[in-house]
Amino acid sequence: MIKSELVQRIAEHNPHLYQRDVENIVNAILDEIVDALARGDRVELRGFGAFSVKHRPARAGRNPRTGAHVPVDQKTVPFFKTGKEMRERLNRDSGDDAPTSDTA
């Protein structure tokens, strides 16, 4: 699902809201999450999950084509940890349809 599909689904479930207003709300929520992460804050949506940032130190990498060692700069990356309710719902909804590993 892409953002425009999310906006459309929310607008369909809330006919009293214009789709443009829903789009503005979704954009505002996403902007606030990104701004909080940029400040180094953690964003927790109880039951859904938590967004945070992780700092990856500089390291020596390798060019897979040539095998040459290349320096990789330190970077900050977004991280998402699912909430308990989401994990439970995903596991409950998948039920017996979940793929199993073939260890025979």
UniProtKB/Swiss-Prot annotation:
The keyword NAD does not apply. Gene3D superfamilies: IHF-like DNA-binding proteins. InterPro entries: Hist_DNA-bd, Histone-like_DNA-bd_CS, IHF-like_DNA-bd_dom_sf, IHF_beta. SUPFAM superfamilies: IHF-like DNA-binding proteins. GO terms for biological process: DNA recombination; regulation of DNA-templated transcription; regulation of translation. Keywords: DNA recombination, DNA-binding, Transcription, Transcription regulation, Translation regulation. It comes from the Bacteria. One of its GO terms (molecular function) is DNA binding. Residues 83-95 have a biased composition (Basic and acidic residues). Disulfide bonds: none annotated. One of its GO terms (cellular component) is cytosol. Residues 83-104 are annotated as: Disordered. NCBIfam families: hip, PRK00199.1. This protein is one of the two subunits of integration host factor, a specific DNA-binding protein that functions in genetic recombination as well as in transcriptional and translational control. Heterodimer of an alpha and a beta chain. HAMAP family: IHF_beta. PANTHER family: DNA-BINDING PROTEIN HU, INTEGRATION HOST FACTOR SUBUNIT BETA. Belongs to the bacterial histone-like protein family. This is Integration host factor subunit beta. It comes from Rhodopseudomonas palustris (strain TIE-1). The gene is ihfB.
